[in-house]
From Swiss-Prot:
Keyword Amino-acid biosynthesis: yes
Metabolic or biological pathway: Amino-acid biosynthesis; L-tryptophan biosynthesis; L-tryptophan from chorismate: step 5/5
Active-site residues (renumbered): 49 (proton acceptor), 60 (proton acceptor)
HAMAP family with a match to the protein in the record: Trp_synth_alpha
GO MF, one example: tryptophan synthase activity
Upper taxonomic lineage: Bacteria, Pseudomonadati, Pseudomonadota, Gammaproteobacteria, Legionellales
Role of this protein: The alpha subunit is responsible for the aldol cleavage of indoleglycerol phosphate to indole and glyceraldehyde 3-phosphate.
Name of the protein this chain belongs to: Tryptophan synthase alpha chain
EC numbers: 4.2.1.20
PANTHER family per the UniProt record, alphabetical: TRYPTOPHAN SYNTHASE ALPHA CHAIN, CHLOROPLASTIC (PTHR43406:SF1), TRYPTOPHAN SYNTHASE, ALPHA CHAIN (PTHR43406)
Keyword Amino-acid biosynthesis: yes
Catalytic activity: (1S,2R)-1-C-(indol-3-yl)glycerol 3-phosphate + L-serine = D-glyceraldehyde 3-phosphate + L-tryptophan + H2O
Gene3D superfamilies per record: Aldolase class I
Length: 272
C-alpha cells in the first residue's frame, strides 16, 4: 500500500485532520532541506510536499517565486531533489513525500526515467500544477506503471464534468485550491470557502485538502473544522527565510509555526 493511503487510513482511524507543509527544495540553501523535512515531521507534518524549483512558477505568489529563485541560484534540479528524498528516507521510511512542481523539468527528464527514479528514491506522488487532468493520460499511465500517485488540483470553479474525470484518475487525495489567485494570497473568506469546499467534497471520492492562503494556526484550525486537512506553504517559507536572513535558526522557526498549527488543528476535536 502507498504511504499516502496508509497515512490517510491512520488519520481517519484516529479522527485527525491531515497537515501537509510545503517547502521548496534547496531553499534557502541545499544543505538545509533534508533537516527541514525531518523538523517538519517532528513538528506534526503528516505528509511533506517538496517543491521542484522552476523558472516560471505561474501558480505561485511572490514568496514561493523568490524561494524558487533562491533554489535555482544553487542550481537545484530534479536529480538534486530526488537525492534529497533519498537522504530523508535513510531515517524516515513512513512519512509520505509528494513532489510538487511543473511539467517542463519532468518532461525534459523523461517521464519513465523520472517515475522510476522517483519511486526508487522514496517519492510517493506528484502534484503537477500545469498539467490538466484531461491532458494527463500519458503521464498517468507511466505513473501507474511505477506505483507513483497523481495528486490533482480542484477549485471553486471546477466543473462537475471535470470532477467526474478527476474521480476516475486521481489517487490519494485532492488538493483543493481555496481561492482564485496564487499561493500566499490574502483573500481567504471562510464562509464562502466552506460552502464551495462542501460542494466539491460531495462530488469527490477522495479526501480534499485545502491549500492557498492558510497563514496562521487560527486559520488552519478554522479550515480544518470542515476540511479533511490543510496545506501550508508560503507562511512556512516566510518563517524559514526570515529566520535565515536574521541569522536565527530556520529549523526552530519553521518547527514552531507548524507545531502551533498542529496543536490548533488537533484542538478542534473530533472529525465531523
Amino acid at each position: 500500500m502507498n504511504r499516502i493511503d496508509k497515512t490517510l487510513e491512520k488519520l481517519k482511524a484516529n479522527r485527525k485532520k491531515m497537515l501537509s507543509p510545503y517547502i521548496t527544495a534547496g531553499d534557502p540553501y541545499p544543505e538545509l532541506t533534508v533537516s527541514l523535512m525531518h523538523q517538519l515531521v517532528k513538528s506534526g507534518a503528516d505528509v511533506l510536499e517538496l517543491g521542484i524549483p522552476f523558472s516560471d512558477p505561474m501558480a505561485e505568489g511572490p514568496v514561493i517565486q523568490r524561494a524558487m529563485e533562491r533554489a535555482l541560484a544553487h542550481s537545484i534540479h530534479c536529480d538534486d531533489v530526488l537525492n534529497m528524498v533519498r537522504q530523508f528516507r535513510k531515517t524516515d521510511t513512513e512519512t509520505p513525500v509528494i513532489l510538487m512542481g511543473y511539467l517542463n523539468p519532468i518532461e525534459q527528464y523523461g517521464y519513465d526515467l523520472f517515475a522510476q527514479q522517483a519511486v526508487e528514491a522514496g517519492v510517493d506522488g506528484t502534484i503537477l500544477v500545469d498539467l490538466p487532468p484531461e491532458e494527463a493520460d500519458g503521464v498517468s499511465r507511466v505513473w501507474q506503471k511505477h506505483g507513483l500517485y497523481s495528486i490533482y488540483l480542484c477549485s471553486p470553479t471546477t466543473s462537475a464534468e471535470r470532477m467526474n474525470y478527476i474521480n476516475q484518475h486521481a489517487n490519494g487525495y485532492l488538493y483543493y485550491v481555496s481561492l482564485k489567485g496564487v499561493t500566499g494570497s490574502d483573500a481567504l473568506k471562510l464562509p464562502e470557502l466552506k460552502a464551495q469546499y462542501l460542494q466539491r467534497k460531495a462530488q469527490s471520492k477522495l479526501p480534499l485538502m485545502v491549500g492557498f492562503g492558510i497563514k496562521t494556526p487560527e486559520m488552519a484550525a478554522q479550515v480544518a473544522e470542515f476540511a479533511d486537512g490543510v496545506i501550508v506553504g508560503a507562511a512556512l517559507i516566510n518563517e524559514i527565510i526570515e529566520a535565515y536572513e536574521a541569522k536565527k535558526d530556520p529549523l526552530q522557526a519553521s518547527g514552531a509555526l507548524l507545531s502551533s498549527m498542529r496543536q490548533a488543528i488537533d484542538n478542534i476535536g473530533s472529525m465531523v
